């Protein structure tokens, strides 16, 4: 790889570190190509990506970034999983690590916060953006449906009372 290619890789990695909601770093020694392709496919499904890069170039790309201390995690055979959604990459990486013992999560970064393996696990346990939106919508919708039910209930009660009175008069 010549100098121009290295500079291009450093620039690409810098953009990844700036634009990603979360970056998860893991060791992948012993993971087969097929298993790595499976991980890449799972990441693509959630809008994330997986990148293997030279640790030295990644550390250069991290220089001056809020997540610069993540460079301490970049030793050995490392892979970076990242996504704009702050939870998606962590969820996929954590689930994949549970299935594959050779994929070991070292930590990661979420903005300027450096995560240890337990931190990545905590982030993975959080609901995704879509799940949070669904929860908020259901919370907002619940009172509205209760109000609609309360408004409709007296009318049905009055109708029931009137039908009972009619039955009594007819009898």
From Swiss-Prot:
Biological classification of the source: Bacteria, Pseudomonadati, Pseudomonadota, Alphaproteobacteria, Rhodobacterales
Species this chain originates from: Cereibacter sphaeroides (strain ATCC 17025 / ATH 2.4.3) (Rhodobacter sphaeroides)
Protein name (record): Large ribosomal subunit protein uL10
GO-annotated molecular function: large ribosomal subunit rRNA binding; structural constituent of ribosome
Keyword Ribosomal protein among record annotations: yes
Assembly notes: Part of the ribosomal stalk of the 50S ribosomal subunit. The N-terminus interacts with L11 and the large rRNA to form the base of the stalk. The C-terminus forms an elongated spine to which L12 dimers bind in a sequential fashion forming a multimeric L10(L12)X complex.
Role summary: Forms part of the ribosomal stalk, playing a central role in the interaction of the ribosome with GTP-bound translation factors.
GO biological process: translation
Keyword tags: Ribonucleoprotein, Ribosomal protein, RNA-binding, rRNA-binding
């Amino acid at each position: 790889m010549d100098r121009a290619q290295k500079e291009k890789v450093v620039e690409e990695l810098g953009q990844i570190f700036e634009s990603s909601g979360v970056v998860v770093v893991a060791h992948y020694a012993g993971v087969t190509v097929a298993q790595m392709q499976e991980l890449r496919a799972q990441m693509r499904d959630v809008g994330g990506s997986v990148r293997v890069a030279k640790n030295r170039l990644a550390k250069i790309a991290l220089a001056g970034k809020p997540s610069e201390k993540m460079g301490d995690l970049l030793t050995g055979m490392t892979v970076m999983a990242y996504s704009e959604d702050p939870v998606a990459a962590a969820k996929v990486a954590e689930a994949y690590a549970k299935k594959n013992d050779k994929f070991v999560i070292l930590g990661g970064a979420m903005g300027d916060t450096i995560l240890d393996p337990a931190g990545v696990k905590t982030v993975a346990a959080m609901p995704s953006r879509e799940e949070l939106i669904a929860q908020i919508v259901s919370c907002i919708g619940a009172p509205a449906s209760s109000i609609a039910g309360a408004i409709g209930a007296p009318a049905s009660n009055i109708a029931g009372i009137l039908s009972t009175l009619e039955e009594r008069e007819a009898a």
